[in-house]
A protein has these predicted regions:
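Outer-membrane beta-barrel translocator domains and adjoining extracellular loop/strand segments
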Residues: 43-50, 90-98, 145-156, 198-206
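Predominantly the C-terminal beta-signal and adjacent terminal strand-loop region
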Residues: 87-91, 99-102, 180-231
Length: 231
């Protein structure tokens, strides 16, 4: 009898230890808000400029981020990422063909803003743990707006920069740290395929109305830290 009580007590203890601490059941929502930084590739575009080479660089941008995750099953989820507009300076360098080793300081071409809504399916490895890591894969749509040419270029007759919308894949790696049944801290890293066709226009290109300068491969890493609520 004593041995039976010990076995039952041990079984109960093991059941308690193995019980889910913060189970993310199907139908659970996780809402997160925080700060994200978009870090584009350096040297996003290299194109010929007569006998020289033009190199375009896009600076980092930081903005508020929002995401909503819906648990379809204990492991599979659907995630939507939104954000306030990210702002970027677009700079250029001209590498002279007569001296390829010489590259002067970059000069500002324009500034622009973009919104990067992203839709992903996620797989959560430990949906009932205190730390809940996950991976995601999905699609991104990026739209550019409020693009402004630098006044120095505008004075020279280059008055507009057009950036087309972009559609591409997005990959994600992240984790939720469950503080209790509801509140959590989240960190995630995303790589997003963003490529946009760019064109300059203005009186400087007369009689042409615009000049295509190529495809700008932004392809940023996005780093974010968020506070979230699960219900």
């Amino acid at each position: 009898m004593k041995a039976l009580r010990i076995v039952l007590a041990a079984t109960a203890l093991l059941s308690f230890v193995a019980a889910p601490l913060f189970a993310a059941e199907p139908g659970t929502w996780k809402l997160r808000a925080g700060v994200g930084t978009v870090a584009p590739e350096s040297s996003n575009l290299t194109t010929d400029l007569g006998n020289d080479t033009l190199v375009i660089d896009v600076d980092d941008g930081t903005a508020l981020t929002l995401s909503a995750t819906y648990m379809i099953t204990e492991h599979w989820a659907f995630d939507i990422l939104a954000a306030s507009p990210f702002s970027h300076d677009i700079n250029a360098r001209v590498i002279a063909s007569v001296d390829p080793g010489f590259s002067p300081n970059s000069f500002k071409v324009a500034e622009t803003k973009h919104l990067p809504p992203t839709f992903s399916f996620q797989y959560h490895f430990i949906p009932d743990g205190t730390i809940q890591p996950f991976v995601g894969l999905g699609l991104n749509w990026t739209t550019f707006f409020d693009t402004k040419i630098d006044p120095a270029l505008a004075a020279g007759g280059i008055t507009d920069l057009k950036l087309d919308d972009s559609f591409g894949i997005a990959a994600q790696l992240g984790a939720d740290w469950m503080l209790n049944d509801n509140w959590l801290i989240n960190v995630d890293v995303r790589w997003i395929n963003i490529e946009t066709d760019a064109a300059l226009s203005g009186p400087a290109f007369a009689p042409a109305t615009s000049v295509d300068i190529g495809t700008v491969a932004i392809d940023p890493w996005v780093y974010a830290i968020n506070v979230g609520y699960s219900f």
